Swiss-Prot record:
Domain of life, source organism: Bacteria
GO cellular component: cytoplasm
Keywords per UniProt: Cytoplasm, Methyltransferase, rRNA processing, S-adenosyl-L-methionine, Transferase
EC identifiers of the protein: 2.1.1.242
Family classification: Belongs to the methyltransferase superfamily. RsmJ family.
Subcellular location: Cytoplasm
UniProt organism field: Halorhodospira halophila (strain DSM 244 / SL1) (Ectothiorhodospira halophila (strain DSM 244 / SL1))
Protein name: Ribosomal RNA small subunit methyltransferase J
Keyword Transferase set for record: yes
Catalytic activity field: guanosine(1516) in 16S rRNA + S-adenosyl-L-methionine = N(2)-methylguanosine(1516) in 16S rRNA + S-adenosyl-L-homocysteine + H(+)
Family matches, as InterPro entries: 16SrRNA_methylTrfase_J, SAM-dependent_MTases_sf
Class of enzymatic activity (EC top level): transferase
MF-aspect GO terms: rRNA (guanine-N2-)-methyltransferase activity
């Protein structure tokens, strides 16, 4: 956990508290203070929402007797590393949509960083990444995961290519230097019942975490991105979903379950 990040839990109304796991009561207290939520003695068995498990690594857990397992942000995770190992500049659809196959060190803003998986893959492929995340708890978990990755010799190089900015993209994008926002990538939070890039447990946790908090609509995200990207905007969409309302994309790059709509700014 990074002591420098102070969080406002108002945009994470679904976060109910922190529960210590094993020998981590001090970590639980520190997380609770940072996030502005209570330390809970036990995991609630009923109700709705999300708790943070103070473990190594920390993880988010849905409430409820039949809730799926916890979701952690861990850039040393074997499944994520398999995805990185299988990604190349020319084969990975996101990398091609961003344009890394032509300019591997492109400066990319992942304006909706979420769990960081897409942004990590782009960084591993050579992109200079700026991550923006409006959720205080996700931003704090991303920060802690990046700190762990920087201390790991195998992943330090990738981690050093990432800068994290907690906050709202509509406010932060204008403050970024133009050289750091050649491409702006957004992965909107899709409504319940739709298929998004992160399915299953991660999507359930993110929806429960944000609960009724209202962030920018996807067309507002697109407008903000188009207003500040210097080369292009890339939007992740379900394969059969309509494009985000607004100007039509210049083209699309298809993946297995999703597609990436590309909006050329200077093209």
């Amino acid at each position: 956990m990074h002591a420098g990040l102070r969080c406002d839990a108002s945009t994470d109304p679904g976060l109910c508290g922190v529960v210590a796991v094993g020998d981590h009561p001090a970590a639980a207290a520190a997380w609770a203070e940072q996030l502005g939520v209570p330390v809970l003695e036990h995991r609630p068995q009923e109700g709705s929402g999300v708790i943070l498990l103070a473990d190594e690594p920390p993880a988010l857990q849905l409430l409820g007797r039949r809730a799926p397992g916890p979701v952690a942000i861990d850039f040393t995770d074997h499944q994520l590393q398999r995805r990185v190992a299988g990604s190349t500049l020319r084969r990975d659809p996101l990398a091609r949509a961003v344009g890394l196959h032509r300019r591997p060190q492109t400066a990319v803003v992942d304006a909706t960083a979420g769990l960081g998986h897409d942004g990590w893959v782009l960084a591993a492929l050579g992109a200079r990444m700026t991550w923006i995340e409006r959720s205080p708890v996700l931003a704090a978990l991303l920060d802690a995961a990046l700190e762990r990755a920087r201390a790991n010799a195998q992943h330090a190089d990738t981690a050093t290519r990432v800068r994290l900015h907690p906050g709202d993209l509509c406010h932060l994008l204008p403050e970024l230097d133009a050289t750091s926002r050649e491409v702006v990538y957004i992965d909107p939070m899709y409504p319940d019942g739709s298929t998004r890039g992160a399915v299953g447990r991660p999507a359930q946790v993110l929806r429960a975490l944000h609960a009724d908090a209202r962030g920018p609509d996807e067309d507002q995200l697109l407008a903000a991105a188009l207003g500040h990207a210097t080369r292009r905007v890339v939007v992740k969409r379900p394969q059969r979903a309509a494009p985000v309302a607004g100007p039509p994309p210049s083209r699309s790059v298809a993946g297995r379950a999703v597609r990436f709509d590309v909006y050329e700014v200077n093209g």
